[in-house]
Amino acid sequence: MTFPVEKVRADFPILQREVNGLPLAYLDSAASAQKPNQVIDAESAFYRHGYAAVHRGIHTLSAQATESMENVRKQASRFINARSAEELVFVRGTTEGINLVANSWGTENIRAGDNIIISEMEHHANIVPWQMLCERKGAELRVIPLHPDGTLRLETLAALFDDRTRLLAITHVSNVLGTENPLPDMIALARQHGAKVLVDGAQAVMHHAVDVQALDCDFYVFSGHKLYGPTGIGILYVKEALLQEMPPWEGGGSMISTVSLTQGTTWAKAPWRFEAGTPNTGGIIGLGAAIDYVTSLGLDKIGDYEQMLMRYALEQLAQVPDITLYGPAQRLGVIAFNLGNHHAYDVGSFLDNYGIAVRTGHHCAMPLMAWYGVPAMCRASLAMYNTHEEVDRLVAGLTRIHRLLG
């Protein structure tokens, strides 16, 4: 069955607009995906007809809002096949989720002389929190190097583990290269050394189904805004036994059981003790609508369509004169490239003149840029609403830029 891309595009109002007098070709979904009417309408309806502060409210609106929020927690747990909804913490996004783990689990479990393993392709959100933790604790940060094609040098991984390795923190899919890492093998190796595993799933959950139980990771985190949902909301999954042992890292309302000026404070049970303050309930409602939306289309069908489009894009872009493509042949979601010796910002500016939106810069992956010896790259990302015609426009635009700039 053909993927209904035109029907999908009709659900995204922003795709009907023009930029610089030309139809928008939005090739920047890896930075943040556009939102369908179903998400926009769900969040709007909540604020128009159902808004109230959640937790402890005895009135109807509060009770309904609380129920709606907790239903999304259950929905998200099914989406990633968690064992229980109580293994999921609502966070602002992937960055906050990783910082929560570093500041809660990491503070309790990392000691001087321990080590944490990451890779050279990580987003800053999966580098900087571990650097900060290691500096604070006197621990070591070890790095899995890359092959030239943008895949991990897995033959070096076993040597990085030892009896002081406490955590492997690894991206599921690179936000720059599109590399999908072989998590089952990596997690199995971590288990041999008694290490925990955190997976940054920000660039994975929109492209194919994720099963955290099958992966057997300890932590999995992703953002709503890359999954066609609102900004400011994400999910942190933690295995239940581990989550119940973790202390809170932020204090305030909603995360406590009792507060006394003389007896101190006791915490709510997990996951609620990690959700201090008033939550982004509207964002949570929107996230639920986004999960409904991609589930209704079928992640397998979305993935098949995107892979077909990716193959076409790589074939066509390879014909552009003087282009350098980064990353493996088999990839998800993104194509990073440079055009001759021209700075990525210049190329991106020209493309914007043609109504084509790509991302330019270091993509929050400065160590990866340093490894490739470039200050920046252009990145085109492909989502379920992109088309062959938009790929053709990108190729034509780059060919024209090469002709103009030489």
Swiss-Prot record:
> Which UniProt key words apply to this protein?
Cytoplasm, Lyase, Pyridoxal phosphate, Transferase
The biological process GO terms on file are: cysteine metabolic process
Q: Please state what the protein is called.
A: Cysteine desulfurase
EC number(s) given by UniProt: 2.8.1.7, 4.4.1.16
Q: Matching CDD domains, A to Z?
A: SufS_like
Does Lyase appear among the keywords?
Answer: yes
What is the annotated localization of this protein?
Cytoplasm
Which Gene Ontology CC terms are recorded? cytoplasm
Q: Which residues form the active site?
A: C364
GO MF terms listed in the record are:
cysteine desulfurase activity; pyridoxal phosphate binding; selenocysteine lyase activity
Q: Which organism is it from?
A: Salmonella agona (strain SL483)
Q: Which residues carry this modification: N6-(pyridoxal phosphate)lysine?
A: K226
According to its UniProt entry, the function of this protein is described as: Cysteine desulfurases mobilize the sulfur from L-cysteine to yield L-alanine, an essential step in sulfur metabolism for biosynthesis of a variety of sulfur-containing biomolecules. Component of the suf operon, which is activated and required under specific conditions such as oxidative stress and iron limitation. Acts as a potent selenocysteine lyase in vitro, that mobilizes selenium from L-selenocysteine. Selenocysteine lyase activity is however unsure in vivo.
Q: InterPro entries from the xrefs?
A: Aminotrans_V_dom, Aminotrans_V_PyrdxlP_BS, Cys_dSase_SufS, PyrdxlP-dep_Trfase, PyrdxlP-dep_Trfase_major, PyrdxlP-dep_Trfase_small
Q: Gene3D superfamilies in the record, alphabetically?
A: Aspartate Aminotransferase, domain 1, Type I PLP-dependent aspartate aminotransferase-like (Major domain)
Cofactors: pyridoxal 5'-phosphate
Its pathway is:
Cofactor biosynthesis; iron-sulfur cluster biosynthesis
What the record says about family reads: Belongs to the class-V pyridoxal-phosphate-dependent aminotransferase family. Csd subfamily.
Q: How does it assemble?
A: Homodimer. Interacts with SufE and the SufBCD complex composed of SufB, SufC and SufD. The interaction with SufE is required to mediate the direct transfer of the sulfur atom from the S-sulfanylcysteine.
Please give the catalytic activity noted in the UniProt record. Answer: (sulfur carrier)-H + L-cysteine = (sulfur carrier)-SH + L-alanine; L-selenocysteine + AH2 = hydrogenselenide + L-alanine + A + H(+)
Q: Just give the chief location class.
A: cytoplasm
